[in-house]
Amino acid sequence: MLWKLTDNIKYEDCEDRHDGTSNGTARLPQLGTVGQSPYTSAPPLSHTPNADFQPPYFPPPYQPIYPQSQDPYSHVNDPYSLNPLHAQPQPQHPGWPGQRQSQESGLLHTHRGLPHQLSGLDPRRDYRRHEDLLHGPHGLGSGLGDLPIHSLPHAIEDVPHVEDPGINIPDQTVIKKGPVSLSKSNSNAVSAIPINKDNLFGGVVNPNEVFCSVPGRLSLLSSTSKYKVTVAEVQRRLSSPECLNASLLGGVLRRAKSKNGGRSLREKLDKIGLNLPAGRRKAANVTLLTSLVEGEAVHLARDFGYVCETEFPAKAVAEFLNRQHSDPNEQVARKNMLLATKQICKEFTDLLAQDRSPLGNSRPNPILEPGIQSCLTHFNLISHGFGSPAVCAAVTALQNYLTEALKAMDKMYLSNNPNSHTDNSAKSSDKEEKHRK
């Protein structure tokens, strides 16, 4: 007791010297108060929070804990407030520096709960969790270090489900539904991710896949039909012999003109593995057939063939032309010419019937020799499937004319030689009688 009194006297002497007063009268009231209640003013074990308080055991890299009096969220109920459950540190509920306790609970448990509070708010435990994730036994250091920053929370959430061979990236990330195996080396962490090139980076796409649908140009407004354009057809339009550029291809596909229309079309073609360089020049002359897609061109050829078959006036043309050659001396020679022409037309149509040019989704096996087949293919690529059927329809109309011309020639021959018919009938009757005998 005397030792404490002497200490207080020394403190008072220091204060008097600092204030410039050396009389002892000022110390007497304080000595009485110290003797009565020596621990009422400021006990040495109490840690009242103030602005100069800094925990001495924090390492330099981490920020010190801010005083509780400066907490703007002190009125909010803190789920990590001090209670008997926090007597031991809880590793599964680490406290962050922004989550502070209220001033009232801190004052009530200042002497007893401050060490546990500091251990719960220690940011080293939070950083240690990230270090375990990046350098844990699963070898995730290289993988998570190379992943994008927005995918890091998803990877952290999936760590409890991670197996040693690899992890599965969730659907919310950029890489969709692809197993990702992260290696242990930083150099090949990204290269070890298998990615579906058909969906992300382009590549070989099914040629029969529909690229887009194009409305017809030749149909009426009351019966507008759309034609499906496949990837193979787009590839044919970009290849020889047409070699369309972005502007012409956009017109064929009926794409609206825009400022970046060519760029968007090239990007869409890159996704299906087709390259359309900028500034490309067309290789063939532009015709009305250039604006047609294959479906509409074939439809046009079929309708043209139907009209030629049903509406072409073959009989009237044959009768008109035969009247110009009514001389009996020319009829035999003309008939032979008609028969020879009909045979030539038949050979020509038979050749076109064996054409196996690629059209639409068909990939027929070639029948003709490569030399003649390549020429027919070139013609069909220029006309987009309209050429060969249209030529066959025209030649069929010519054959119908030849047939009607031969019939008219026979009628003219019989009308000019009426006795020949009776002579032929008599000869045939004589042969039948001999055969009966």
UniProtKB/Swiss-Prot annotation:
Expression across tissues: In the brain, highly expressed in the hippocampus, hypothalamus and cerebral cortex.
Modification type Phosphoserine: residues: 239
Motif PPxY motif: chain residues: 57-62
Pfam families from the UniProt entry: TF_AP-2 (PF03299)
Signal peptide: none
Cross-link (Glycyl lysine isopeptide (Lys-Gly) (interchain with G-Cter in SUMO)): 10
Gene Ontology molecular function: chromatin binding; cis-regulatory region sequence-specific DNA binding; DNA binding; DNA-binding transcription activator activity, RNA polymerase II-specific; DNA-binding transcription factor activity; DNA-binding transcription factor activity, RNA polymerase II-specific; DNA-binding transcription repressor activity, RNA polymerase II-specific; identical protein binding
Polar residues bias (residue ranges): 414-427
Inducing or repressing factors: During retinoic acid-mediated differentiation and by nerve growth factor (NGF). Inhibited by the antidepressants, citalopram and imipramin.
Keyword field contains Ubl conjugation: yes
PTM entry text: Sumoylated on Lys-10; which inhibits transcriptional activity.
Cystine connections: none
Record flagged with keyword Cell cycle: no
Biased composition (Basic and acidic residues): 428-437
Record's compositionally biased regions (Low complexity): 65-74, 88-101
GO biological process: anterior neuropore closure; basement membrane organization; bone morphogenesis; cell population proliferation; cellular response to iron ion; cornea development in camera-type eye; embryonic body morphogenesis; embryonic camera-type eye morphogenesis
Compartment(s) where it occurs, according to its Swiss-Prot or TrEMBL record: Nucleus
Keywords for this protein: Activator, DNA-binding, Isopeptide bond, Nucleus, Phosphoprotein, Transcription, Transcription regulation, Ubl conjugation
InterPro entries: TF_AP2, TF_AP2_alpha_N, TF_AP2_C
Region (H-S-H (helix-span-helix), dimerization): 280-410
Domain comment quoted from the record: The PPxY motif mediates interaction with WWOX.
Function statement: Sequence-specific DNA-binding protein that interacts with inducible viral and cellular enhancer elements to regulate transcription of selected genes. AP-2 factors bind to the consensus sequence 5'-GCCNNNGGC-3' and activate genes involved in a large spectrum of important biological functions including proper eye, face, body wall, limb and neural tube development. They also suppress a number of genes including MCAM/MUC18, C/EBP alpha and c-Myc. AP-2-alpha is the only AP-2 protein required for early morphogenesis of the lens vesicle.
Family: Belongs to the AP-2 family.
Protein name, entry field: Transcription factor AP-2-alpha
The organism of origin for this protein: Rattus norvegicus (Rat)
